[in-house]
Structures are given as C-alpha cells and as structure tokens.
Amino acid sequence: MSPVEISGADAVVSPPMRGRVPLPPPPPPPPPPMRRRAPLPPPPPPPMRRRAPLPPPPPPAMRRRVLPRPPPPPPPLPMFDAEVLCCCYPPTRVRREAPLPPPPLIFVGAPPPTCALKGIVCCFPCPSKKKSSLKRFNWVKITRALPGSLWDELQIQQVCHGDIEDEQILCAIELDVSEIETFFSLGAAKPEKDPLIDLRRATDTELTLMLLNIRLPADMMAAIMAMDESVLDDDEIRGLINLFPTKENMELLMSYTGGKWTLEKWEQYFQELRKVLRVESKLRVFYFKIQFSTKITQFKKRLNVVNSACEEVCSSQKLKEIMKKITCLGNTSNQGTGRGVTVGFNLDSLCVKSMHNFCKVLASEASDLLDVHKDLQSLESASKKQLKSLAEEMQDIIRDLEKLNQELTAAETDGPDSQVFRNVCWFCSYGYFDQPWI
C-alpha cells in the first residue's frame, strides 16, 4: 500500500505501515453528566396597579343665556275725585271670526279716557300689587260666558272700545265708593289676647262652655244667687265646678289690670263671676240643693230595705227555732271536743253538706219550719246592699249639710245681695242633723 501524497503546506508524511492495519482514533470522552433540575416556573406577570376610573369629562360649558329684564309695571292710576266709580265685570271671551291685533299700551304717561257720564271712569285691567282694603267678596268665578247667557249679553252691551282684546272687555256701572267702603271695610285689627294660663286648658274650657251652652255672666250670677233651676241645671253647674280655675289662676284673674277684651272668653266669664263672694262655694251649695231631694230619697229607700230585713230577721219565730235546733245538733256532734258547748255560731262557718243533712232531719221532724222564707221577704234584696257604701253615702250627706250651714253663716254678713240666697236655702231648716239615722 503506497502512502498518500498530500501536497501543500498541510501535507504530512506518514511512515509506511508495515503489514498492520492502523487502529482507529479513540472516541472523544463523554461529556460530564448534567444534573437534572425541574424546569423553573415562568415568572408571574407584574402586578397591575388598580386605579379608580376616571370621571367622565364634564359637559361643555353652556353659555348662560341672559334673559331680558321684564318691563317695569305701569304707574298707578291717578286718583279722581269722583263719587261714582266704574266697576267692571271679569274678562270673558266674545266670539269673533278673526283675532284682533294686540291693543296699544294704555295709561302710560296719559290720563285714562273718561266716559260721557260725569263721575264715571272706565278702567282696564292692569297688574296691580296693591292689596285691597275691602273684605273679600265670596263667589264662584265664571271665566267664560256661554253664548246667549246673561253674562254674554252684559259683556256685549258694556263694550267701551272695539279694539280691546276679549280678555280686557270690562263694563262700567255706577257705584258709591264711600258707601262700599262703609259696608265692606276690613275694620280695625282685633287686639291681641293675653292668656293668663296655658293654651291647652283655655281651649278645653272654652269648648266645654260652648257645649254646655252657658249663658251671659250677668244671668249666671243672678241665677246662682237665686238658685234658679230654670236657668242653670245640674249638668251646667257641675261643668262650671269642674272648669273652675284653681286658686293660683283665680289670683291671677283678680290681680289682672289689663283690658277686658284681651282675655279669653272663659277668663271673661270667671272674671265676672268672681264678683260674687265665694262663688265656688255657692255653686256647690246650688248643686247640692238640686241633688238633695233625689239623693235623700234614694238613700232612704236603700236604708229602709236594710231596716226591713233586720226587723224580719229579729221577729221571725221560725228562724229562731231553726237556729236553736242547729245549735243543739252542733253541740251533740262536738261533744267532748273544744268546739262543743257553744252558745251560738257564725253562719259563714257552717258546712253546706251539714246543712243538707240538717234539712233532711228537719223535714222529717219539723216540716212546718221549712217555709221560713215567707217571713223574710226583704232579706234577698237587702243582701245586695253594702253597709260600707251606705255609711259612706251618709257621711257625704252630713258633710254637704255642714258646708251648707257654713255658707249660710258666712252669707249673713254679705249684706242685702245675699238675702235671696239665704231665703232659698229652705231645705236646711228641716233639721236633718237631728234625724236618728244621722
């Protein structure tokens, strides 16, 4: 095998190989082992800053439109020395085929036109802010006159100028201004009232006086002194007593030095009534006089029922015999005990079962005693009366009679004005203080 010839600078002359096959070059060393690592996660996206949404842009500024100033109002009408004024009907529409042109301005720098009649002025509606000094005329306004009606006919007859609009058509009539002001003037302002007590009590008192239909103070004073039941009844007197002012309010009324008409209505009533000496005491005596006969009659009726029942119980021989037998039966049953040998017993302590057994014994031995209820006719009605209420009612009557006696004693020094009051208290001379039931 001949050597390979390579020409050039890179030619290498290899020695001739002697009968051996040349070995291949050694393989390159393996690369160093690489450590297996988990792939890194992708980096997170950068945080986004939260920003508040921007407000919407403001609308483009609109040019402010300057409105023209309204024209000044026309000057007020001059005052004329006329005894008769032209009053006009409210503006109404009159049917026309074609609208009229707008009227020219009237009464600006020129006096108003006058009618042919002396003292009559034709005026047209113009805006006026002056408040009328007359009372308001209450009516239902008609804004449109129906064709063929009375108002339509009057509007057509009273047209003063043909070039005036329908809304300005006015009519002229003769009116006396001084007479109108006399009848329809507002009058002087009422004086302010000066209440002496709280408004709530004053309102309640005034409403009660209206419901009771209280008369004039002069009539009331005369009726109280004479105790005339035809003028004031018991309901009205009781209402006056309940509404009577307290001691503090009465002192305020007595010390009041202002005008009479500046007080409330009920304060005026009681200010007139305070002229009567001890008016509240006299009102109570008057009320007691009206109620006296009825109260005494009803009290005597209830008291007589109780007295009759007591008399029947004390006089019934059958009831006494029954009580005697019950006592003997009880002593026999309770012999040898602490409850035996008794002289009497309480009816409430008896047992109902024992009474049933006693009635069986009584029916077999003394049947004539079973009709004892015939001797006690008033006992059932008397059992419904309460002795405590009767005693309280009797004490009330005695207390009222004592107050009456005190008022009569005090009225002796009041002079001739209280003479009628002393004479009408006749029921005190009957001597109820000496009655045995009192």
Swiss-Prot record:
InterPro entries tied to this protein: FH2_Formin, FH2_Formin_sf, Formin_homology_domain
Disulfide bonds: none
Membrane spanning stretches: none
Biased composition (Pro residues): 22-61
Residues covered by region (Disordered): 1-74
Pfam families assigned to the protein according to its UniProt record, in alphabetical order: FH2 (PF02181)
Top-level taxon of the source organism: Eukaryota
Segments forming domain FH2: 124-438
Matching SMART domains: FH2
Family under the similarity heading: Belongs to the formin-like family. Class-II subfamily.
Protein name, per record: Putative formin-like protein 21a
Organism expressing this protein natively: Arabidopsis thaliana
Upper lineage: Eukaryota, Viridiplantae, Streptophyta, Embryophyta, Tracheophyta
Gene name in the database record: FH21A
